[in-house]
Amino acid sequence: MNHLKTAILLAGLTALFMAVGFAIGGRGGMMIAFVVASATNLFSYWNSDKMVLRMYGAREVDETTAPDFVRMVHELARRADLPPPRVFIMDNPQPNAFATGRNPQNAAVAATTGLLQSLSPEEVAGVMAHELAHIKHYDTLTMTMTATIAGAISMLANFGLLFGGGNRNNNNPFGAIGTILMVILAPLAAMLVQMAISRSREYEADRGGAEILGRPMALASALAKISGAAHEVPNYEAESNPATAHMFIINPLSGARMDNLFSTHPAVENRIAALRALSQQMGGGGFAPGPAPAVRPPGGNPWGVDPGGGQRRGPWG
């Protein structure tokens, strides 16, 4: 079912991409846009995860550089019957995280330094379990490819604003006014297509993550903390690339932008209420939680590398 939803979502975005091409260059522009969209879909399938990780400056860590954090993620993956994903850390003060990858065999999870330094070990485990649930449901393929294609739609629309104006002619059937309208509406439409699926998937990942960890309220507590900080601590990379906002566990946009009017995430209060209800249903049961990793005093470098180049152990190993 998730593969069908992914196909429908990508078809919708491809059609939108072609519509922008038609607005800019008529039938010729539409055909070029179709070729570009098809190539983008193919390229995104194989490379979108690498692009997003590079976009956020994520660094891969292992059991040498961040042993506690990596072992925790691998233990959660074992409980979820998933192969261990690659683990990345982003040098960003905003507490947040996302997962990416075309399938569980090629998946990765990424957390910010802000998340590792401001949340308790149980809360971090709840966040990582949520991301692993996305991987298990194959949400990461849809989220990452959607981010790439939606970004391409915005770029094409901006191109149309710069070069697609002028008088109405065969190459530009809508003229300057039509092109401007398309520039405004196309990115918004792309965001609406993203919203069609991503909100329900967040609830499913919350539930799946809570079941993996066995502690729904650990995730609920993490959501409350991350949500509060996301409005106070800016994520400049996300502000520059709002098409990737739906990938994060909490919307990373500050709220000062128009993008936030079309949030890809359900209200945090509703997510917490659903987790609280799940906790009552589980009655303290669910999967038996493993021991949370010991956290060291805050202020260290989660990568375990000091400015002088020597190795030292940070709060996550």
Curated annotation (Swiss-Prot):
Residues 290-300 have a biased composition (Pro residues). GO terms for cellular component: plasma membrane. The chain crosses the membrane at residues 6-26, 28-48, 145-165, 173-193. Its cofactor is Zn(2+). One of its GO terms (molecular function) is metalloendopeptidase activity. Residues 306-317 have a biased composition (Gly residues). InterPro entries: HtpX_protease, Pept_M48_protease_HtpX, Peptidase_M48. Keywords: Cell inner membrane, Cell membrane, Hydrolase, Membrane, Metal-binding, Metalloprotease, Protease, Transmembrane, Transmembrane helix, Zinc. Binds 1 zinc ion per subunit. The active site is at residue 131. It is found in: Cell inner membrane. It is an enzyme of class 3 (hydrolase). The keyword Zinc applies. It comes from the Bacteria. Zn(2+) binds at residues 130, 134, 202. Residues 283-317 are annotated as: Disordered. The keyword Nuclease does not apply. One of its GO terms (biological process) is proteolysis. Belongs to the peptidase M48B family. This is Protease HtpX homolog.
